Amino acid sequence: FYDIDTPVTLAKLDARDEEYLSPALVPAFDFYLSFTGGPTLERLRRDYGARLPWPFYCMVDPSIYRPTGEPKRWDLGYLGPHRAVRHRARGRLLTEPARHLPCRRFVVAGAQYPDSIDWPGNVELIEHVPPSAHASFYSRLRFALNLTRRNMLATGWSPSVRLFEAAACGAVILSDRWEGLDSFFPE
């Protein structure tokens, strides 16, 4: 079994929500591959009887995700759809700095951003960047902003694929803090 959203799965198991997995089924798997590592693996074993829980983190193909050599276009950028839970962090880490640094260029790329957001004039909004253009996008950033979903922040050890994409393309990453981050990107 490969669980690509272990923090959500655990919340559902704890709530006895059996939408796609029941607690009784977990011990039946030979392996439980988890998007999340760290203490979550022991919890899967202890609380739900997973026989062999192993971390199987997101990854990128380095032949696709690599620096493109394009000139830097933006000082700071974020790639991801609008989510209300990330709005405050994005405002604090991107929108507000953009307001205070009008001579710098910023970019937000993703779907579902409401028209009601008051973007500063130096923030470019791109509605969609197809996966085939992610390497180009990240390569043109001086800094890439990584914002982690709330349940993944609480669980830790849950790196998103966007984090690895940005790193593989040579972008300097500014990220919120979560347990385990330093094991993926040691000092």
Q: Which residues make up each language-model segment?
A:
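Short, polar loop motifs at secondary-structure junctions
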Residues: 4, 36-42, 109-116, 177-180
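Generic structural signal for helix capping and beta-alpha/helix-loop junctions
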Residues: 8-11, 63, 116, 155, ...
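A generic structural signal for alpha->beta connector loops
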Residues: 29, 50-53, 103-105, 122, ...
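A local structural micro-motif
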Residues: 52-53, 107, 146, 174
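Conserved catalytic-core segment of nucleotide-activated headgroup transferases in glycan assembly
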Residues: 59-143, 153
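Catalytic binding pocket for nucleotide-activated donors in carbohydrate/polymer assembly enzymes
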Residues: 118-187
